[in-house]
A protein has these predicted regions:
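Structural preference for beta-rich elements and adjacent junctions enriched in aromatics
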Residues: 20-262
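Bacterial N-terminal signal peptides that target proteins for export
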Residues: 1-8
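Low-complexity intrinsically disordered segments
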Residues: 1, 14, 24-27
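Bacterial N-terminal signal peptides
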Residues: 8-18
Length: 262
């Protein structure tokens, strides 16, 4: 496991520093006048007990859905639809992501591996308005359930994949369910669901605090890589819930506002 962990970290470090070129998130295609609308999301208190099992239970149905996904940089509507929900209680920050997917694909099976090469759902968040925030966290979990977690303490120093990869979200709960057959291109699938619970005590900037205050502002976005033979020319589709002006999911300046509500 240690060897695989080191391999994952080394590979990620190379991707982020440019010594290899297969990380598509390094492609910074920009448009002159971004037209995406910045939509704020309210993180409500969980209306009931949330069991992390990768399913849309009754508690989740009462949480507002985030449906405004688009494909950067031109803000096109994704072919593969995604829906996200976010809630909290005294112990955890919860996320549920439901993805339509006709061709489920994932091969990365070791922790902190290159899950972006697979069908993957991602959650990025930072402790304040994006332009004023240095640190952030991202989770990238593939359709197999493999977890990549990273903490970036100071984004002004660049993307240090090796250091970010060393952080582990202690006590993280995650679950994936699929409607379809993984890695079977001859059939047509329906999609998959990811559910995670991030302990407040595991978040570096929450030391000494139990949970965010009522009305506190953070920033975030949900993101996705979808690889499918059913997409035009069989290419991948990248989408986000934030108006990113370039194909770069780590663009903290353009994370969307997230307000906590009791």
């Amino acid at each position: 496991m240690k060897l695989m962990k080191l391999f994952g970290c080394a590979a990620l470090a190379c991707m982020m520093t440019g010594c290899i070129s297969f990380s598509r998130e390094r492609t910074e295609i920009t448009i002159t006048e971004p037209s995406g609308e910045m939509i704020a999301t309210t993180c409500v208190r969980a209306p009931g007990k949330i069991v992390v099992d990768g399913k849309m239970d009754e508690a989740w149905k009462a949480v507002p859905a985030v449906t405004h996904f688009h494909c950067p940089p031109n803000y096109e509507e994704p072919i593969s639809k995604t829906e996200g929900r976010i809630a909290w209680d005294d112990n955890y920050l919860y996320v549920l992501l439901v993805a339509q997917d006709l061709d489920l694909m994932a091969y990365t099976d070791f922790h902190d591996g290159p899950t972006y090469k697979d069908d993957v759902l991602e959650f990025f968040f930072a402790p304040g308005p994006g332009p004023k925030t240095l640190e952030y966290i991202n989770f990238e979990i593939n359709a197999m359930g493999t977890v990549y977690d990273a903490y970036h303490p100071d984004r002004t120093k660049g993307l240090n994949g090796e250091e970010a990869c060393k952080w582990e979200c202690e006590g993280l709960k995650s679950a994936v369910t699929r409607k379809g057959t993984l890695n079977e291109p001859l059939d047509k699938d329906e999609g998959w669901t990811l559910e995670i619970a991030v302990p407040w005590k595991a978040i570096p900037w929450m030391k000494g605090r139990q949970c965010p205050a009522d009305g506190e502002e953070w920033s975030f976005h949900f993101a996705r890589y979808d690889y499918s033979k059913y997409l035009p020319e069989g290419k991948e589709e990248l989408s986000s819930s934030a108006p990113l002006p370039k194909v770069f999911f780590h663009d903290v300046d353009h994370f969307a506002p997230l307000y906590f509500k009791k």
